[in-house]
Each structure stands twice: as C-alpha cells, then as structure tokens.
Amino acid sequence: MDYSRCCGSTNSRVIYMNIDEKWQNAWERDHVFEPKIDERKKFMITVPWPYTNGSLHVGHGRTYTLGDIIARYKRSRNYNVLFPMGFHQSGTPILAFSERIRAGDASTIALYRSYLSEYGEKDIDGWLEKFKDPRNIADYFSNAIINDFKHLGYSIDWTRKFTSADEFYQNVVKWQFHKLNEKGLIKQDKYPILYSIDDDNAVGEDDIKDGDTDKVSVEEYTAVFFESNSYSLIAASLRPETLFGVTNIWINPTGEYVKIKIGDKIAVVSKEAVDKLKYQRNDVSVIGPISAESIQRKKFTTPFGKEVPVYKADFVDTDNGTGVVYSVPSHSVYDFVYYRRKKSGQTPVVIEAPLKMPEVEIKFDLNSKEGLDEATKELYKSEFYYGKLVNSGEYTGLTVRDAREKIKKDLIGSGKAIIFYETSRKAVTRGGSKVIVAVLPDQWFIDYSADWLKKLSHDMLNRMMIYPEMYRNVMNDAIDWLKERPCARRRGLGTKLPFDDRWVIESLSDSTIYPAVYTTSIQMRKLYENGKLDENAIERIFDGGEVQNDEERTARNEFSYWYPVDIRLTAVPHISNHLSFYVMNHAAIFPPEKWPSGLIISGLVVSNGAKISKSKGNVVSLLEITKKYSADIYRLYVAVQADVSSTMDWNENDLSNIVRRFNEFKTIMDSFKPDTSELNFEETWFVSRFAERLKQFMDQMDGFQIRDAYINIFYGTLNDLKYAVNRGASQNRSLASIIADWLRALMPVISHHAEEYWHRYVSNTYVSINPFDDNFAEKYERLAKVYGLSTSEFYQVMDYVEHIIQDINNIISVTGIEPKSVEITVANEDVIKASREFLSNSVSERSKRYLQYLAKRRKDIVVYPFNEIDILRRNSSYISRQVKADVSINTGDIINGKIAVPGKPVIHIT
C-alpha cells in the first residue's frame, strides 16, 4: 500500500515509533502499571485472555484497546487500577496445528511460515521443527502477543501473568471442578456433542473455525422411516408435525446412497449420513451401495399409511441430515417451488396459520435464494407461533408446538422414527477437520440447568452494570437457554479432570473464574513451587478460613482487595458461551460480594466492509499496525471510529482523516511555547469552553461513550482552538491554561504522545498515573469570573454570537442585498424586564405596552445570563469580518414596528 497516503511521510512514522518505544520502555522500567494495595478505591478490569495458536489481528486489537482506554481513564480519576493479562493455551487447536506440522501438511506449514516471517524470524525451518511440540507454539505466540500488546501501549500489569498450561493454575481448575462436583453440577452420561472425526475428539466453539462469530450447535432431528416392501428410506426433519402433508420424497440424483441395517430394520441413507449414524448409535452396519435410480423406482409409505413417490431434486444435500428429504409443498417454500415443476394442482394443507403459501408466492421473490430463505423464515415463524394442525388425524387442533413434540414422541415410541443429530451448519475445526455430532456414552458435562444456579445467575445479572443495557435481556435469555455443557475431552492440552484423569477439561470450561487468579497469581505460583498449593490452600485463599503462612495471607489480602472484577469487557459473540459460563461459574462458586460488578459488550470488527479472514486478504495483524501506523493512531481510530457496541470497520481511507487531524495536533503541540500572562476575552472563552467540554467528557467516559467523549475532547478542542485563534486569541496563552488537563484527558487514547508532551511541558511525573484534581473546575471558574461569567455562561457566548451572524447572513441571502452596514439593536432594559414578566405571566402596567409584540415573538425570547450588548460590542470586529460590512450595535425596543427581544436583536442592513 501507499503508506504516505494514510500515514504521512516515512520520517513522521519513524518519529511516532520513537516516541512509542521511548515511553513503552519508560513505563516498563519504572513499573508504572504494577499497582499495590493502597487506600484508594480499586478498579479491576479484565479482557478475555488471547488464545495462543497464532498472531492477533486488528479485530482482536479493538477489544484489548478499549479495555486499556477504560483502565487508563480510571487511573486519571484516581482509581487504583489493575489491568492484568494471561494466555489461554488449552484445548485442541494448538495440538491439532502441531500435529499437522508434524505430518507435513502444506497449508498449515505455509500459515506458520507467514506468521514467523511477519515476526522477522530468520530460522523459520528451525522454528517449524520446534512447533512439532504444541507447547512451543503456545509459548512462542504468548511471547509474541506480549510484544504486540506492549507496542500498542497497553497498561497491563505483566507481573501477574500466567497461562492455562501453568501447573499452579491447573491446581485451581481442579479445585474449581471439585467445588462444582460438590454442588451436584458435574455429571457423566450419554450425550450428543460436536465431534471431529479426524481428531477423534469432542470439539467446542474455540476449536471450530469461526466458531466464535458463526455459532455451531447441535440440532435434534426426527428421522422418520418411510417403508416399502423391501427397505425403508430414512428422512430427517425438524418438523415432524408436517408429516400429514407429505406429497413425495426427494433424493439427489447424483448422490451416493447406502443400504444399512439399523436395529432390526433395513434402511437407506446417504453415504455421508452413515458415518454420522455410526457415531450416534451402536446398532448400525453397512450392507452395500444402492443407486438413486433404483430408489426412485419404488414407492414408500408414510408412518400414517399414505403412499408417496420418490422424485429427484438437486437441492438435496447428501451431507445434511440423512440425504433424504420428505416433501410438504404447502409448508416448505423450497418444496413448493420444486414440486410445482413436477406437478400441478392443490397440495394438502395440514397447518392453519396467518401466512399461507399462496400469500408467500405473492409477497416474496421465489426465484432467488435470498427470497426463498426469507420466505422460509417467515413461513416457519408464522406456523410455529400461531399455527394449528388441520387434516392431521388425532393431532388435529393441536398447536404446532404441542403437535411437534407429541408426534415425535409417538413415532419414536412405535419404532417409526429415531432421533438423529446434526450440526446447525457445516463446520470444520481450525485445523480443517470435519465436525459432526457424535453421541458419547460416558461424556462428562457441567449441568447448567439446575434451577438454583439459574436463579443465582439471574440475580447476578440483575444487579450488574451492563453496557449496552440492551444486552441484559440477551444475557438472561442465554442463561435460561443453557443446559448440560460438555466439559471434558479425551485429548487436547489442559487440565486433567480430577476425578477421571483419562479426560482433559475443555477450553471453555477451564477459563471461567481465571480472573480471580490474577489477584493471587504471584503468591500461588510461589506456594506451588514450595509444594503448598493444595486444594485446602486454595480454599483458604478464595473462601476464607485461617491462613497457614505469609504467602497465603498475602494472597488472601490481594483477593479480598481486588476482587470482584469491576468491568469485564468482551465482544458480542461470547455471550452464549464465554460470558454465560463466566457468570454461572461465579454464581456457583463465589459469594455474592465476589460476583462480577460490570460487563461491557463490544461490537464486531470488519475490514473494508467484509468479515476479516485470510481468504479475503483483509487480515491486518497487530504487529503490522504498529509498523505502519504507530500505536496512538490505531488507538485513536479504535476510540472514534465506532461506538463501543457498534461494528467497527477497519478502513484505511477513514484512517487517513484521523492521521490528518492527529498531525494537526502534533504540529500545535510541537510549536507550543507556554505563555501564562493574563487571558483576553477570546482566550477566556476558549478556556471556559474547554472546562465545559471536560465535564461533558467525564460524563461520557463514565457512561462508556468513548467515541463521543473523544470526538468532544480531541476534535472539539482542536476546533475550538482554531476558532479562538482566528478571533484574536493567542494559541500559546490559550493552551497554557488547559494543557495539563487536556493531556490527562487525551492520555487514555493517545497515550504515548500525551506522555511525551506532559514531560515536555508539564512535569517529570507520568501523566498515565497523574489524576485530575477533584476540584479541577474551580480554576476555570476563577478565570471566567474575570469577565463576570461562569464557564457554562461563557460556553453560550460564542453560540449566541454565531447565531447573530447566521441571522445576518440569512437576511442577506433572502434579500440579495450587498451590505455596507449592519445595525444590530439589542433589547433594552425595559424590554428585558417586560420579557421576564411576560414569561412568568405577571406583566406590570409599565410593561403592558410591549405585550402584543412579545406575544408574537414568544418563541424567540431567550434571557441569557450575560449582557448581550457587551458581548456583541466585544465581538463587533469579528462579526464585521464575517458579514463583510460595518457593524453598529445599540439598544432599543420597537424599531420600525419590530421589537428587539432578549436573545433576538432587530437587524437592519443597508
């Protein structure tokens, strides 16, 4: 790309990077972000620890940057802030990638070559050899991410760092699972689970490609036997209530089908379905292949005795369900379209609902996939929520909801159907292995369906600060939805299940209460190294009891002071898994006073309008960010490009605008020469305007409106300064009065440059930990009082002046006059008094002569706290320049039949 187009000259980028590196080194050298317990109010913020199977990109960076902005802002408000970080090294993805490198998989090796090349490694082959051990992948990228985070200026306390592979942490996870088991939440039973055939292992969201943003779940189908005189066809459906409306069966003419023995029945399914059935049942065996043509020659009978033909349809996916589909044209849009090509006439209607197929045909475009999908969604919704069965034998009159469950139960009970599980979408693991649903006979899971646990979780959410508020109901719904969750696998990296070490605790279940360990990691590590971190010690630290040694005592104090987490910040895809497990495990294990206090859910990130992926070529790594743009420019982009809850689009065209304003800021600051002499009127207006902006900024930041806050305090202040200077203010005098507080406000976002200018112009302390004065507003009020105004009154002054200028220009535009002089007549004291009386409905005899005029201009009357004539005379030269005419300013009442009212002078142009 053309760097100069978005980032200025190469020399500018070098200067930025030198400043970045200078202050990153200083912060680390002086342990600036390693807080100790003190008398201040504490604030603990956590962001999900990164998974260490590769480099992080611009999308990941948004979440961590937002977390750092909030942490830094809280320091500026004199909170004792802990912002810790660790690394997630559990699960199967790291192991799978390592195995693929060991097996010589070309695509995996190419991927890791690109990672290593980006990090500037010379001995790439040597590193690839090391990556055959999965622990080396995890450790390499943990260290790489630390460097990425440091280069972005994150104010993380790295002394508390640990990983999910650390043995002391695994002791904590074992303690956690014993606690869950004691509460009856750990179960072992037959259970359907997402499964990788190649890896021979259960998988979860963290293991599946795009599993966090494009969820994959287990769906339960009713697989129905359609019988003939020699074998059955098995057709799987989510809607058994439509069986009375079947007209035919669809199969794919080019698909491969297989005859199998399932229980005591002979049946036919697609070749792909055989593997799925084998992983779900132990009574399936293959007899042999069967052609689509031979299937089509037969007729089959529904479970309710209706004989139906078999038709070919290329829309049938043999890798979805059983590869056999029964057709209900009156209640399936795709069936309707395809059936109409084969047959004409009426088809049986078995569900009465508001939306019917004839209306669907009119309302939606059934010639496009988008139209078909939209129509399908609307029809299913109408029938599910409002439909009742008709022409359906004994089930007639039942609602769709009730009929679905009853028909399913009856069919399975009579041996005419079985349960079949399928993934909600096609999925592969991060390593590329196909994901199916398997039923494991001895699966371990956490039972999240317990009523007492759901109640505690709802109690937690209802007392928690959640931003945006709209996600409170979403979180409560997610808690209600959760049932049993598989928590262990046969292979992978991580902690052994304490009561069955053949199993490894899966990666979403070993990372739920880990924020508590940040508070105690230093002491727990020492206890473990000394052989003293057993479950009793962990219990004493987290759950009370008499401590046994100084390390336990210190750990207990750290936990008591820092916990709970005040803000957990994560992205919206984590609601249904990470966040729900986080809430419910805290509810199960900790008392209410240690429950998380707040939750911020950020939006997604796209790049140039598209989902970020290597295949689209729009992945920008965090390392690339700091090399191309500098940390502060990226941080500013994250802050102002989108609201926290909105989708952020990483777009270099937008970046160029931010760089331009950032360079404007740098030019102003680099040329600044402090001047503390007395302020004139325009400079006092600027300072007062800043004071009001600063109050607004704090309110916005306290409400996590980060975008609005920095548009206000960064862009707004730059604009105000330019405006004031154009009106006669000294840039140096104006800045001198606000520079310390402006840099404090900018520090959370443009952290490195704020630190640079703080040291250059303010103090040798660190602005990163130099909070605002609690009484910061008083100094600005003192400056404003020189002119007899408060800062809020000064804030209105220039708005008033600009409105007068706008009124003059409007008159010029409407009349077409080329003005030579403008006479502005401001309401005199009599009119001002009369206006106040008029607005309060108590008009004196003296004021009644103005009553008819005031009544006509009621909406124009604004009684300002300042003297209008004084303000306009002070600004007469400016007004004259703006309207390009001589300006005179007087007071009066009624001029040529018009009254000058407070806030709206009479303007006469010649």
UniProtKB/Swiss-Prot annotation:
Chemical reaction(s) catalysed: tRNA(Leu) + L-leucine + ATP = L-leucyl-tRNA(Leu) + AMP + diphosphate
Entry binding sites for ATP: K614
Signal peptide interval: none
Keyword Nucleotidyltransferase in record: no
Gene Ontology annotations for the cellular component aspect, listed alphabetically: cytoplasm
Domain of life assignment: Archaea
Gene3D superfamilies reported for this sequence: Class I aminoacyl-tRNA synthetases (RS), HUPs, Isoleucyl-tRNA Synthetase, Domain 1, leucyl-tRNA synthetase, Valyl/Leucyl/Isoleucyl-tRNA synthetase, editing domain
UniProtKB keywords: Aminoacyl-tRNA synthetase, ATP-binding, Cytoplasm, Ligase, Nucleotide-binding, Protein biosynthesis
Similarity comment text for this entry: Belongs to the class-I aminoacyl-tRNA synthetase family.
Record-given protein name: Leucine--tRNA ligase
Record organism: Thermoplasma volcanium (strain ATCC 51530 / DSM 4299 / JCM 9571 / NBRC 15438 / GSS1)
